[in-house]
């Protein structure tokens, strides 16, 4: 039974929908200022949005920059937008902090091949992910 449904008096549609020990809900905390200085004793995840240049192989080259610099990409989602949905934007999460040398090099490659890059944030990697 959903706790949220109980609190707000809502009808539960399916009681077994999320009954897996691996299910998680993620919440994002937004700030105008960066708040995660690099600590070499911690593991980080960085998230960003980017659009590649409209040239053959641009996405491949962005991905290659992460691979070459030994940066693990853990999530990549694509979204089409624009009047005719011809522009593709990607949401990406990587293991790493922009203060780490290898991540810095990978991001420099990324800026070279992308028409737009927007850093969304950096957060400490949850111990939950380490169990996966």
Residue spans of the language-model regions?
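Domain-level signature for soluble enzymes in the chorismate/prephenate branch of the shikimate pathway
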Residues: 1-132
């Amino acid at each position: 039974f959903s706790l949220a449904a109980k609190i707000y008096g809502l009808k539960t549609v399916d009681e077994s929908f999320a009954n897996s020990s691996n299910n998680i809900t993620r919440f994002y905390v937004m700030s105008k200022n960066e708040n995660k200085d690099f600590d070499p004793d911690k593991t980080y995840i960085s998230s960003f949005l980017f659009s590649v240049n409209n040239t053959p192989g641009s996405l491949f080259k962005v991905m290659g920059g992460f691979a070459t610099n030994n940066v693990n990409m853990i999530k990549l989602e694509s979204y089409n937008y624009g009047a005719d949905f011809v522009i593709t934007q990607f949401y990406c999460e990587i293991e790493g902090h922009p203060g780490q040398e290898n991540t810095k090099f990978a991001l420099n490659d990324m800026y070279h091949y992308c028409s737009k890059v927007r850093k969304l944030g950096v957060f400490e990697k949850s111990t939950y992910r380490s169990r996966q």
